[in-house]
Amino acid sequence: MLAILDYKAGNQTSVRRALDHLGIPCVITADPAVIAGAHGVIFPGVGAAGQAMNELLTTGLDKVLKDQVQAGKPLLGICVGCQIMLDYSQENDTKALGIVPGECRLFNAAWTEEDGTPIRVPHMGWNSIVQKRPCELLKGIEPEAEFYFVHSYYPAPPESYVIATCTYGEEFCAIHGGPGLWAVQFHPEKSGRPGLALLRNFYAYCKEASRA
């Protein structure tokens, strides 16, 4: 079973629907015991980093998440979840979780597309990613597959944590982390076949890890 972290940050229901479609058992929960008993945790989020962190701190779920990561529980952050896994976000000048080193930065409106057109912020719509190093999440997914993005800020971890990038005016990190600890800036639950494949891969990894 996968635990979808319930901290009033938006897209838990759409994540659950995607997992239901795949036949993957899951529950939306804020119960530490349920989270501890799950094969893995999905940490979704939409909205503002400051508000999301306030919810985590108010409910104590920040500590629950960190404890599970320390215990080796697989974790998948999505969108704002991906951003606040880092140390800091420029959005609302937010001290974040610090699970992964790095910061989250606002897109530079001076960046331009290849034809010289200024980018629009937020970055919204389908865009391809380029894999930089092997990752279990991307098994069987076509190179440069397209995923659905909606965001004004982007993660900027150290290069050694960058798994895949996307280009929107300039190249930015689209997936970061390491084995069992991943974060994706796009929305896999809204990304059609590639997104469903990524969620399926995460669950397969979680099940295998639980047997180890």
Curated annotation (Swiss-Prot):
The keyword Membrane does not apply. The active site is at C79 (nucleophile), H187, E189. Coiled coil: none annotated. GO terms for molecular function: glutaminase activity; imidazoleglycerol-phosphate synthase activity; lyase activity. PROSITE patterns: GATASE_TYPE_1. The keyword Transferase does not apply. Its main location: cytoplasm. It catalyses: 5-[(5-phospho-1-deoxy-D-ribulos-1-ylimino)methylamino]-1-(5-phospho-beta-D-ribosyl)imidazole-4-carboxamide + L-glutamine = D-erythro-1-(imidazol-4-yl)glycerol 3-phosphate + 5-amino-1-(5-phospho-beta-D-ribosyl)imidazole-4-carboxamide + L-glutamate + H(+); L-glutamine + H2O = L-glutamate + NH4(+). CDD domains: GATase1_IGP_Synthase (cd01748). Keywords: Amino-acid biosynthesis, Cytoplasm, Glutamine amidotransferase, Histidine biosynthesis, Hydrolase, Lyase. It is found in: Cytoplasm. GO terms for cellular component: cytoplasm. It comes from the Bacteria. InterPro entries: Class_I_gatase-like, GATASE, Imidazole-glycPsynth_HisH. Pathway: Amino-acid biosynthesis; L-histidine biosynthesis; L-histidine from 5-phospho-alpha-D-ribose 1-diphosphate: step 5/9. Its EC number is 4.3.2.10, 3.5.1.2. Residues 1-212 form the Glutamine amidotransferase type-1 domain. Heterodimer of HisH and HisF. NCBIfam families: IMP_synth_hisH. IGPS catalyzes the conversion of PRFAR and glutamine to IGP, AICAR and glutamate. The HisH subunit catalyzes the hydrolysis of glutamine to glutamate and ammonia as part of the synthesis of IGP and AICAR. The resulting ammonia molecule is channeled to the active site of HisF. This is Imidazole glycerol phosphate synthase subunit HisH. It comes from Nitratidesulfovibrio vulgaris (strain DSM 19637 / Miyazaki F).
